[in-house]
């Protein structure tokens, strides 16, 4: 589909080095929530080798990464090595930072720096270059401490309103109701995703109503099944506009019902295939 947000959604395609099979060698078993039979949470462990320059510390092992963290801290920031994404993931979990909003805040800042809307004078001397793994680690530590430029990043999508960025920065912010887009897809490609994010009840949160099955080819090839699934005529192509309101409304109602009974979104009908 070419629908992956790269460098704050400036591009929609990235390198194959972050494909799923390249993470298999770092998997250290599976885990799950208490009494959940699915056990969908991968464990990771990074070896200490001269190639990846990974030291054995608290961030060399942990849970994940999931797709959102992979997208936000991989292509979203110009990173193409699995070891770096895994380490960022473990840092985020240890520091208690949300990977979606934090990754988006850093990507936004990097594009503003790229375009000259902010300079080293605004960042405390930091050069916000895409793909700089050491810089990203430093930014995470600064953010959690609200130290230096980390104070601006911690303001997240509200940095303009709080006087940290110029008003022109809003043209490069992927957010709704002050909340950054929570998934790494480029929603301009998948029209149902775009509509869902625009009307979501909690900012740009894909977990409220995302029509995940729009990217399932088998479902799109069966018009009758798709009609019954969403209770309305929905165009087969993810890039078409027709009928996507039926799919978004159906998903929002189903997900709200799942939330009401405490059901994990990944086990909720319509969210996963």
Question: Model-derived features: where do they sit?
Answer:
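Extended C-terminal regions of large enzymes
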Residues: 1-273
